[in-house]
């Protein structure tokens, strides 16, 4: 039996937006996303690509048909608003009682959510999966509050529709810092949905968006082991700091969003969190699984770690890098 763990809204958002040349959602064994709410709630609105978790006549959750869960990279389950793994729902019941006494209204229709539907469903799925089953912390309510543009009423997704899905930038610091590519940086709908106001462009190419003065920091370097990205780290960090301080979301991007932009964000996390290169690397890798700064950038990041922390604490000769 696999483990059942919590998954934040940001983690699910990033899972949905992983890509290589195409969205990872097009891979049949990548993600099984299950909605454990009622049929009515599911039909009203659910997270894109989610399937409704079915139950038998005794209200026991059933394994989804035609899905090989033991081969799935991710299995994520959500209900309305589960926020812990104990499943007792005491906080939710307490909140409902407060609403009852204040408004004299109690909606019994939603009482079945207090028993931790997502947890019950996840435990059934964990009996056949190899990897941990994730329960979405905060459920649909929290996720849809942050990412309203990922709500859908579509029940069936055709393969071509999945192939045509255009991923959004990866979220590094919730609501404030994103990692993307040139196409995403040029998409007005993405900028609006994520409330992105500022860009750090780590590529030779410009975007087709005209940003106000002071809202873009351009680092025109090629993706080469000989490129001196280090000289731009201090001013880039100051730029990101100044915009995040005013709750202004920043998108850091390069042509493909894999090497140059990843390197700059690793440098920023070392500066921002005063963490090691290894810790910053692990965070970016967790957010974007195919990030890969070139070897020249790795050496520069090692120098940056020493400049910020006073010591070189990460062994970059390790094959991991």
Regions found by a protein language model. Name each.
Residues 1-2, 159, 321:
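Long, low-complexity intrinsically disordered regulatory regions
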Residues 1-33, 38-41:
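N-terminal alpha-helical scaffolding segments that mark the starts
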Residues 19-20, 65, 104, 320:
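Generic low-complexity segments that are intrinsically disordered, proline-rich and/or Lys/Arg-biased
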Residues 25-252, 256, 264-312:
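Cysteine-based protein phosphatase catalytic domain of the PTP/DSP
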Residues 312-321:
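Extreme C-terminal disordered tails of eukaryotic proteins encode short linear targeting/docking signals used
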């Amino acid at each position: 039996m696999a483990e059942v763990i919590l998954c934040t809204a940001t983690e699910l958002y990033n899972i949905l937006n992983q890509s290589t040349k195409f969205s990872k959602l097009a891979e049949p064994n990548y993600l099984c996303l299950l909605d454990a709410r009622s049929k009515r709630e599911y039909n009203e609105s659910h997270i894109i690509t989610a399937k409704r978790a079915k139950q038998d006549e005794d209200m026991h959750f059933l394994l989804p048909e035609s899905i090989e869960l033991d081969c799935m990279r991710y299995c994520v389950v959500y209900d309305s608003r589960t926020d812990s793994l104990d499943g007792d729902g005491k906080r939710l019941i307490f909140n409902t009682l407060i609403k009852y006494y204040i408004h004299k209204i109690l909606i019994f229709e939603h009482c079945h959510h207090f028993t931790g539907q997502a947890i019950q469903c996840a435990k059934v799925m964990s009996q056949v999966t190899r990897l941990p089953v994730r329960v979405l912390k905060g459920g649909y309510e929290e996720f849809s509050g942050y990412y309203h543009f990922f709500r859908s009423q579509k029940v069936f997704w055709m393969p071509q529709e999945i192939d045509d899905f255009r991923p959004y930038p990866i979220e590094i610091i919730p609501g404030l810092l994103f990692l993307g590519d040139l196409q995403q940086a040029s998409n007005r709908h993405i900028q609006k949905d994520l409330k992105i106001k500022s860009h750090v462009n780590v590529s030779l190419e410009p975007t087709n968006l005209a940003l106000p003065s002071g809202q873009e920091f351009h680092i025109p370097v090629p993706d080469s082991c000989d490129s001196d990205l280090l000289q731009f780290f201090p001013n880039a960090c100051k730029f990101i700091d100044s915009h995040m301080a005013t709750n202004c979301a920043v998108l850091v991007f390069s042509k493909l969003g894999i090497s140059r932009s990843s390197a700059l964000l690793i440098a920023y996390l070392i500066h921002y969190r005063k963490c090691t290169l290894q810790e910053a690397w692990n965070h970016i890798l967790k957010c974007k699984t195919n990030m890969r700064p070139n070897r020249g950038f790795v050496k520069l990041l090692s120098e940056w770690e020493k400049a910020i922390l006073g010591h070189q604490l990460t062994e970059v000769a390790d094959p991991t890098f």
